Amino acid sequence: MAKAGKRIEKAREGIDRKKTYGLDEAVKMVKDRASVKFDETIEVAIALGVDPRHADQMVRGVVALPSGSGRTVRVAVFAKGDKADQARAAGADIVGDDDLAEIVQSGKIDFDRCIATPDMMPLVGRLGKVLGPRGLMPNPKVGTVTPDVAEAVKAAKGGAVEFRVEKAGIIHAGVGKASFSEDQILVNIRALIDAVQKAKPTGAKGTYIKRIAISSTMGPGVKVEPQSVAASA
């Protein structure tokens, strides 16, 4: 525990917690401080000027990260017949209908993304209490309820990341790994911010993107000047 405390203190050296940095500089600082033995995830936190308790201020979407996510994503697909075959051919890890529903109902959630064909939604809808709290409920708005299951599986496997604003008005998303180059992380962050901008709800008033911070899994956060994201693109 003492070692962890010392490592965190050392990682914070050179970071002014009151200052906001340009995106390029912030990414370099975070990468330089990712020093633990595993390949840390680079994470972005975006504070938005919305109140997600109101339906017209909800923000959610999906973004295809140009550099990929660096994660091995396990994908489950609810489909039958030819659609099930297409999902398997595209690389889905688990494919089924009633049998998959039974697995989910038992609480055995061994996947990171859940996709369904539209005709499966009456079945999947009954699993909302299990899938919903885990952020796994298929939704047409983010492309996880679709007749084109093959494309959805490929997108999920290839680095598509879902984002959704939380109760406090903040979006958290992983945008790569510490082993990525700075350029790979930068293009992923810009893609995420662009997708969040495009998902701006009609009910949003005033400043939309209020604050941005980036960090590695075990590292300190670095505040980013929001204008620098567009300026450095």
Curated annotation (Swiss-Prot):
| Any one annotated GO CC term | cytosolic large ribosomal subunit
Q: Give the gene that encodes this protein.
A: rplA
Q: Which UniProt keywords apply?
A: Repressor, Ribonucleoprotein, Ribosomal protein, RNA-binding, rRNA-binding, Translation regulation, tRNA-binding
Q: Name one GO biological process term.
A: regulation of translation
Summarize the protein's role: Binds directly to 23S rRNA. The L1 stalk is quite mobile in the ribosome, and is involved in E site tRNA release. Protein L1 is also a translational repressor protein, it controls the translation of the L11 operon by binding to its mRNA.
Q: What is this protein called?
A: Large ribosomal subunit protein uL1
Q: Which Pfam families match?
A: Ribosomal_L1
**What is the residue range of the signal peptide feature?**
none
Report the InterPro entries cross-referenced here.
Ribosom_uL1_bac-type, Ribosomal_uL1, Ribosomal_uL1-like, Ribosomal_uL1/biogenesis, Ribosomal_uL1_3-a/b-sand, Ribosomal_uL1_CS
